[in-house]
Amino acid sequence: MLYTGTDIIEIRRIKAAEARWGEHFLNRIFTPAELSLCKDRFPSLAARFAAKEAVIKVLSLPKNQSYTEIETLNLPEGQPSVNLYGQARDKANILGIKHLSISLSHCREYAIAMVVAQD
């Protein structure tokens, strides 16, 4: 079976949240590895935030899901990949999810992520 999740976000929302809450916001949402990976900062962070939301949708996770349990990094070839920890990993195991494929994109104003889960 295939499961899909998509999310889109305005990049300015991530900028505004960082301006308002600073490092506390960033550390609550992103892992240290994700933060170090995002060179063009806000477009990349917004795409990774959208990825986390798409994974939450694909796995039907609760609203209070810890965002740092969903990590989006890059494979050596450059394509994005998802690592799951804690409750997110447990839910994927319950659903029999063996593989998550992810696509990220952004333009000047928006970032989008699409996740396909396969059992």
From Swiss-Prot:
GO MF annotations in UniProt: holo-[acyl-carrier-protein] synthase activity; magnesium ion binding
Protein name per the record: Holo-[acyl-carrier-protein] synthase
Recorded catalytic activity of this chain's protein: apo-[ACP] + CoA = holo-[ACP] + adenosine 3',5'-bisphosphate + H(+)
Keyword Cytoplasm in record: yes
GO BP annotations listed: fatty acid biosynthetic process
Keywords from the named record: Cytoplasm, Fatty acid biosynthesis, Fatty acid metabolism, Lipid biosynthesis, Lipid metabolism, Magnesium, Metal-binding, Transferase
Function: Transfers the 4'-phosphopantetheine moiety from coenzyme A to a Ser of acyl-carrier-protein.
HAMAP family named in the record: AcpS
Source organism of the structure: Dehalococcoides mccartyi (strain ATCC BAA-2100 / JCM 16839 / KCTC 5957 / BAV1)
Binding positions for Mg(2+) per the UniProt entry: D7, E53
Pfam families assigned: ACPS
GO CC, alphabetical: cytoplasm
UniProt record similarity statement: Belongs to the P-Pant transferase superfamily. AcpS family.
Source superkingdom: Bacteria
Compartment(s): Cytoplasm
